[in-house]
Amino acid sequence: MNIVIGYNDQFNYIFNNLKNDTLNNSILISGNKGIGKYFFVTNLIKEYLIYSTNNKNIKHHLSLLKNNTHSNIKVLKKEIDLKTNKIKNFITIDQVRNINFFSRETSQIANLAKFIIIDSADNLNSNAANSLLKILEEPKKNTYFFLISHQPSLLLPSIKSRCLKINLPTHNFSDFSEILISNNITDDETIKFLFD
């Protein structure tokens, strides 16, 4: 199993509950910005796809996941404002309404769960947050919301109360070194500099 360095326990807990159909429909993944929360979630979904498809057409599924085009996975993040050509300050209510439709649709792939990744839930404006709350109050079976948050204190308490909370701590030096070495950064001085 492809486990994210430093977060094996959290990964295994979520994955085992997912494959046993005992996972809460809403999962809040929190931790400092830049520690790999999105990477954690996408690797979790990757392992789920491998497990649930018994490796049938897995290259196709993984290619779709990598390109953000998988029909069972939606990523919600700040969009580009077409008028200004700049990234919007918030995730809007219209974006949340679109994922509501997605969450209610029947899966295009039989027996395969659907995933909605909100990166980052901290960027929901108040109308979007309230709309998301209504969706989370009536979860659809086999649809999972992963809310990524750098500052959970910014989220509505009522949203947080509906989520399984998983905190990913900042990596210790050993895990940090392992990540860099796995990415072919092996110079000790560089590793120490980047860690500090």
Which residues fall in each region the model found?
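Clamp-loader machinery-focused feature within the broader ASCE/P-loop NTPase space
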Residues: 1-127
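Active-site catalytic microenvironments for nucleophilic, acid-base chemistry
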Residues: 47-51, 135-138, 179
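A generic "binding-loop/recognition-motif" signal
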Residues: 120, 151-152, 172
